[in-house]
Amino acid sequence: MFRRWLIGSVPVLVVVVLLGTGTFYLMKARTFQLAGHVVSRVHTDARVVALTLDDGPSDRAPEVLKVLADAQVPATFYLNGRDLAAHPEHGRAIAAAGHEIGNHTYTHRRMVFVTPGTVRDEVEGTDAEIRKTGYAGPITFRPPYGKKLWTLPHYLAEHDRVTVTWDVEPDSGRADATADDIVAETLGKVRPGSIVLLHVMHGHADPSIAAIPRIVAELRAAGYEFVTVSDLMSR
């Protein structure tokens, strides 16, 4: 009898494994979601690229803003509502410098297996903090870690908002990456319409910050123009 039960349970186990695997890949997919629209890059022949900077703002913001100003390059900052509330002066400085500000949720939690109410609070609370900075432009949205399943995409679709991911991430999960590594990977992967993700606000951010002027100089020499995410999506 046990043998019969074991044989009968195999198809069930296979289905469970397949569902689990499918859910895992769906959560981390950069180019697909179950509802609404997701953008990892814009398909264009024009040599345009968007530089995006995730998390914060933190006390590194003044240094990052100086690097961007010296390079005369626009960026899209995906900021957390909690950090904006804690460091309103940095949010105001980012807005005053003319950069685009995007929504990266309030608490930077993984937005999977969450309730509609949680999604609403995470998104709308951050929108409110962004507007307090004086920023009046479009607010695009990026999920923390790029993770989403059903509730988040459904909410964004209902509110006519796009999920913005990326196609170049040279410093993600690489605590030992040097500025040389980050520059080399970026230059090797950028294509017309690329969205580049860097982390410059927390942790091991020095190499990423140091890489920005070199990335900008090299890509401009190759004929690229830097634009904000909303500008890129309007192409």
Predicted regions and their residues:
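Short, solvent-exposed loop/turn segments at secondary-structure boundaries
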Residues: 113-117, 175-178, 206-209
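Active-site beta->alpha N-cap acidic-glycine motif
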Residues: 27-114, 118-132, 138, 234
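Short histidine/acidic/glycine/proline-rich micro-motifs that form metal-
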Residues: 81-84, 107-110, 147, 169-173, ...
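Terminal accessory/targeting
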Residues: 1-51, 58, 66-76, 188, ...
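A cross-domain feature marking catalytic cores of carbohydrate-active enzymes
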Residues: 53, 79-81, 103-105, 143-145, ...
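CE4/NodB-like, metal-dependent polysaccharide N-deacetylase domain
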Residues: 66-76, 100, 116-149, 154-158, ...
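Charged helix-capping and loop-helix junction motifs
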Residues: 120-123, 178-183, 209-213
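His/Asp/Glu-enriched short active-site or ligand-binding loop at hydrolase and phosphoryl-transfer sites
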Residues: 147-189, 223-234
